[in-house]
């Protein structure tokens, strides 16, 4: 997969204004992402999701995140995530490598 350190920089630049990753981290505009891998969409405790997110029914993993992060609104029509996505595959790979580590510590 990608480079964890590059992924951390991408997370700080593009994701951290709306998300946290640490265990017990607070929800912001978007949910805390701790425990993301292996969890179904729309399941972070204490966060209010759209019906689209709750009903998507996929399990978050490398493949689903690769597709979602390229174009969130295309992958889950009706999501309230306003982020336009990351077009460069290498950047998505780096971000996923970071998320895999950071959301599991």
UniProtKB/Swiss-Prot annotation:
Binds 1 heme c group covalently per subunit. It holds the Pfam family Cytochrom_C. One of its GO terms (cellular component) is mitochondrial intermembrane space. One of its GO terms (molecular function) is electron transfer activity. InterPro entries: Cyt_c-like_dom, Cyt_c-like_dom_sf, Cyt_c_1A/1B. GO terms for biological process: apoptotic process. It is found in: Mitochondrion intermembrane space. Keywords: Acetylation, Apoptosis, Electron transport, Heme, Iron, Metal-binding, Mitochondrion, Phosphoprotein, Respiratory chain, Transport. Heme c binds at residues 15, 18-19, 81. The modification N6-acetyllysine is found at residues 73, 100. Electron carrier protein. The oxidized form of the cytochrome c heme group can accept an electron from the heme group of the cytochrome c1 subunit of cytochrome reductase. Cytochrome c then transfers this electron to the cytochrome oxidase complex, the final protein carrier in the mitochondrial electron-transport chain. Belongs to the cytochrome c family. This is Cytochrome c. It comes from Saimiri sciureus (Common squirrel monkey).
